[in-house]
């Protein structure tokens, strides 16, 4: 058999892609490992949207679902109805759907995927294809094709925390009990199995009434991040905020905050921490471009990644993974593939104008971001004196340094001056170090109101910036904070103390011996405990010191400082993922 388009994955993006391509008259082969369509939207029990509503074909499908529900009673509610609608629409337009199908090989010639082999149980099948679309989430097809992949944060390769989702009974519908459950390597069958069993404990409750009766585990764990393709255009957080991202050929726009679930923030990138910690900007929702070249793996002519594995970096991946955005890129990828198949050409040879004409593209909403990111000097000055200084701090990066320094020199100690100190610290300005030290020493408790949630106290934000500026004068006081188990905001201060000490040690090799001694006192003492609340839960606390000890041990190894942290790790109640991290550390 020969098909115009192969779609691997019939989930949130893949189901929309299959319907869109089949409607255009393309012959479509869908390979889905599960037994139903919709992915996270259906089997994941998350039928809704985050901040951005559906658009285009996805909105059309949702309208069909609502109409079907209004006509009668359906067991399972929207999630089950949506399965029926998606399958019906794909079949109605002639798509071939193979459930329980696992791709095992692809044929690649001159940068084009020309054939696929898959298994259904023990039976082997194959087909020739003209265009290919990877909508698996984990880049299964791209892996088989030999695409270059990246993923995880730069410091240690870790992905975002995942969710062990359970189906629960709502008042009038079926919903999801959707709590963070720590980190997991979903590519390891052993770790995935152990992790899913262990993290069921997050659902233990004293009361299962009030719409919280648990019905079943989700078929699909809430995996927020895996690998990303290295694409023809990699969309990065740095390029987005600097304005250097090419937005001339977009297939749509996503609206979201940079929705991180990480609670070990000191190991994220500097830019990411500047946004989240330095300016308390977690809740700031922005418009992001979805460039078409970010869908194409570098060097390939007819292959696209239309799922969360598409070409973005770890930092922006926190925002560009939501259901609405996945529907948008699924529809766009299908339209693009059909045009390329009809022209018998490579994807990038299809004129952008032809593709754009087929898409429900709105006028660019990107200028709306300016109200948060491009305040003028007067608004910056006013904002720095207020309760929501984050927008002014970020916007200040566009103002002349000399202007900010003159404001700083003229100002008395005040909220304005302290917020301005953070703005200048974003530029590595050493003149603010004395004030940062004072805020840290005072444990300044002021919390801004920039974000709707997760604002950060000035005291430990100052500690973050002291590490960012590699202030070697405060090594001993920072060490005292790390080892003090009775302090308020113990987790926040201790975690950022570790981050600061590691940064200072990287910048000042002559201080590594002393810093190493402090870090060893923490990491070799099994009674040093760090607890953090899992996001999405009211009171579920997770012990985090194991992960921090592992990072400290890795760094001390790199510095050539002997330690006995491995012996301490053997005594701790590490979770499944930490054990694997510890094993890899020992194997180095």
Show where each model-derived region lies.
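Alpha-helix capping and helix-loop boundary segments enriched in small/acidic/polar residues
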Residues: 9-12, 49, 74-77, 317-325, ...
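Short glycine/serine- and small hydrophobic-enriched flexible loop segments
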Residues: 19, 23, 332-342, 502-506, ...
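Conserved N-terminal/central alpha/beta ligand/cofactor-binding core
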Residues: 20, 26-27, 32-109, 150, ...
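Flavin (FAD/FMN)-binding glycine-rich loop and adjacent Rossmann-like elements that form
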Residues: 40, 119-120, 124-131, 135-385, ...
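Short, hydrophobic/aromatic-rich segments at coil-to-beta transitions
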Residues: 110-116
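Amphipathic alpha-helical scaffolding segments comprising HEAT/armadillo-like alpha-solenoid repeats
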Residues: 368-378, 397-410, 429-450, 471-485, ...
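Structural detector for internal amphipathic alpha-helices that build alpha-solenoid repeat scaffolds
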Residues: 385-398, 406, 410, 415-430, ...
